[in-house]
Swiss-Prot record:
A ubiquinone binds at H201. This is Cytochrome b. GO terms for molecular function: metal ion binding; ubiquinol-cytochrome-c reductase activity. Keywords: Electron transport, Heme, Iron, Membrane, Metal-binding, Mitochondrion, Mitochondrion inner membrane, Respiratory chain, Transmembrane, Transmembrane helix, Transport, Ubiquinone. It comes from Myotis welwitschii.
Amino acid sequence: MTNIRKSHPLLKIINKSFIDLPAPSNITSWWNFGSLLGICLMLQILTGLFLAMHYSSDTATAFNSVTHTCRDVNYGWVLRYLHANGASMFFICLYLHVGRGIYYGSYMYTETWNIGIILLFTVMATAFMGYVLPWGQMSFWGATVITNLLSAVPYIGTNLVEWIWGGFSVDKATLTRLFAFHFLLPFIISAMVMVHLLFLHETGSNNPMGIPSNMDMIPFHPYYTIKDILGLLLMIMVLLMLVLFSPDMLGDPDNYMPANPLSTPPHIKPEWYFLFAYAILRSIPNKLGGVVALVLSILILXXXPLLHTSKQRSMAFRPLSQCLFWLLVADLLTLTWIGGQPVEHPYIIIGQLASILYFSIIIVLMPITSIVENHMLKW
């Protein structure tokens, strides 16, 4: 008699995805972040669901409803800070996951990579909308500044912005619709994650050497289930340290002031995970140019398979490309720092140079370096 997990219509899907899935025997801890992202998504949906039960999406009561959740609801503060810092963990895992994909050439699985980019955009949109909901000063002004960027679209820009606002400024209608979309999008993300996995399981996982591993596969369970649980425990530990010891470390103190359309905060800036893109946006002294650069800073990932000129897939044995990769990481950290600084000398010029370097590394330097490495290996 066949094992029920292999014969039952539902269980066999789970079996083929998480139990009997053949996986390369040499994938490292950099491959843990996919499962961690799945856990983050589930955590965000659960905490978000319970927060939504106590939230009121009206400009008059939104700020107070969040305060009420923190003060009067049993463990409401835990829910709120798990959700806020869970978003930070989500983005840390996301950026490490994408970085792993770039380093080891996982982008050569184009379908998986492309839906991953769409997922990244969707998660960023969801996080932005979530940041508006507490209706503090930074929520309101962040929403005003970022939605206003759409007015840079030629001809239809102003109409587009007013259509999104539901009026002539960020107000009650805006908050209500952003709450609706913030609630809806994670479920769409969940569906897209399934498609992401579907495409991945068509090809199987990549591995650190970037070579086919069909001759050396091991079952996902127990080897990688145990490995994923270790990663999960470490992530939960870091998250709980954040939530229980310094829940506001990554937030902005301005958001503890109720939204006031009549007073602008001294420095409007998004959450830390958007600062690199915000720095790129600000480094171009033209509104439309800045918006284009902002979108391209993520969309450029779609070109990674087209810009791959190396005869090897992974960077594991390409020291010059490795140097460029870590330069790119350092550049992104620099941009993140600049995004949180005021617009004044010397931050302006540093941001502009870092932005130029970001695009140069990806579009020009990496493909050229790969060609040089091919010649060095006489390929």
